[in-house]
Amino acid sequence: MAAATTSRRGPGAMDDENLTFETSPGVEVISSFDQMGIREDLLRGIYAYGFEKPSAIQQRAVLPIISGRDVIAQAQSGTGKTSMISLSVCQIVDTAVREVQALILSPTRELAAQTERVMLAIGDYINIQVHACIGGKSIGEDIRKLEHGVHVVSGTPGRVCDMIKRRTLRTRAIKLLILDEADEMLGRGFKDQIYDVYRYLPPELQVCLISATLPHEILEMTSKFMTDPVRILVKRDELTLEGIKQFFVAVEKEEWKFDTLCDLYDTLTITQAVIFCNTKRKVDWLTERMRSNNFTVSAMHGDMPQKERDAIMGEFRSGATRVLITTDVWARGLDVQQVSLVINYDLPNNRELYIHRIGRSGRFGRKGVAINFVKKEDIRILRDIEQYYSTQIDEMPMNVADLI
């Protein structure tokens, strides 16, 4: 395993060769960026960004995408999905043509903005123009940018749909549609908006779905707008997040969760921690309660103005804040390297979300710890999660701080 023995581990060197892919016959595994047929100035950007070696999903998915095939790619959180999307799109786009040629839809503003950032960094030497079309930002800015001309739009379904209907986002040159975090996009209320967007796109369209989990009902939906897709799938049993130790703390009643969190606070601040609640109201309540007990925490959820969300994300990314309380808006693919502890103050409402949340705590094979607060009535959900991911969640040991 070359990645394991590399002395200088860039963000792109990963110990994930042991993932088992259930992949369409004939999909090549290409173990270096140089062998992918990528243009020279794009390769410069990839290496400048710090990548050394493609991850397992990049080794398999980039070539089919840049060859024009429809693709369903499944990769667990932290395996380099965003950079795989960015790399493929940068290769496909003709930067001499100042029109939108690729559209990437994401379920959250933060993920759409992150995709824009990574693409601009990787595509620095090809002068790619990318715009994040997301709610909470000025519509005037969207109109100005789109009329000036961009090659790629990375956005959320609502705002993208709005821009298309206003005829500000012209779709005639779009040749590639990518749905990132497709399980969330199609399975949780975004379905209608995606179909709305899809109706405006040219008939000769390449479609790619990328996600950490692909439940059966999602795969059924893909038949409606994909032609003979290449499948690149991780076996579900392999989706346990390697290197992440998972624990639970039994709490008799809801109020005890707060005391447990306070007891753990010193452990949290050893590194950086994310605490997940199921509702925005709970995030606000917990944040206020922690602060009134003199604990330093920051908070983020979907009701906050975009500017405030950006500022909070920036502080957390830079390490200025160490404990972030949030809802599942944060669980979808955001890349903060230092996070090695996740606490599920509330267990997630569905088992697919579990992997998105705890995937946050060990990106690219980094070790991590996930702690679940579990009431008596939650035991069933916890057992269901264990069974679904073929994993074991043990009671939290006293020396949990030593594991982080």
Curated annotation (Swiss-Prot):
Which SUPFAM superfamilies does the record associate with it? P-loop containing nucleoside triphosphate hydrolases
Keyword Hydrolase recorded: yes
What EC numbers are recorded for this enzyme? 3.6.4.13
Q: Where is this region: Disordered?
A: 1-21
Q: What is this protein called?
A: Eukaryotic initiation factor 4A-III homolog B
Could you list this entry's UniProt keywords, alphabetically sorted.
ATP-binding, Cytoplasm, Helicase, Hydrolase, mRNA processing, mRNA splicing, mRNA transport, Nonsense-mediated mRNA decay, Nucleotide-binding, Nucleus, RNA-binding, Translation regulation, Transport
- What biological function has been recorded for the protein in this entry? ATP-dependent RNA helicase. Core component of the splicing-dependent multiprotein exon junction complex (EJC) deposited at splice junctions on mRNAs. The EJC is a dynamic structure consisting of core proteins and several peripheral nuclear and cytoplasmic associated factors that join the complex only transiently either during EJC assembly or during subsequent mRNA metabolism.
SMART domains (alphabetical): DEXDc, HELICc
> Assembly and partners?
Interacts with MAGO1 and Y14B.
| PROSITE patterns according to UniProt | DEAD_ATP_HELICASE, HELICASE_ATP_BIND_1, HELICASE_CTER, Q_MOTIF
The chain positions of domain Helicase C-terminal read 243-404
Q: Which residues form the Helicase ATP-binding domain?
A: 62-232
Could you tell me the superkingdom of the organism this chain comes from? Eukaryota
Q: What class of enzyme is it?
A: hydrolase
